[in-house]
């Protein structure tokens, strides 16, 4: 659940293991 330091509005998350939640990239923690 930690923020990955990138947004994902209209673009994917680049950081491995991170996914898009509410327009920001978070990891599974």
Curated annotation (Swiss-Prot):
Crosslink site: Cyclopeptide (Gly-Asn): 1-29
**InterPro entries assigned:** Cyclotide, Cyclotide_sf
Q: Can you cite a GO biological process for this protein?
A: defense response
Pfam families from the entry?
Answer: Cyclotide
Q: List the disulfide bonds.
A: 4-18, 8-20, 13-25
PTM comment: This is a cyclic peptide.
Q: Name the UniProt key words of this record, in alphabetical order.
A: Disulfide bond, Knottin, Plant defense
- Family as reported in the entry's similarity comment: Belongs to the cyclotide family. Bracelet subfamily.
Role, per record: Probably participates in a plant defense mechanism. Has no activity against bacteria up to a concentration of 80 uM. Has cytotoxic but no hemolytic activity.
Domain remark in the UniProt entry: The presence of a 'disulfide through disulfide knot' structurally defines this protein as a knottin.
Protein name (Swiss-Prot/TrEMBL): Chassatide C10
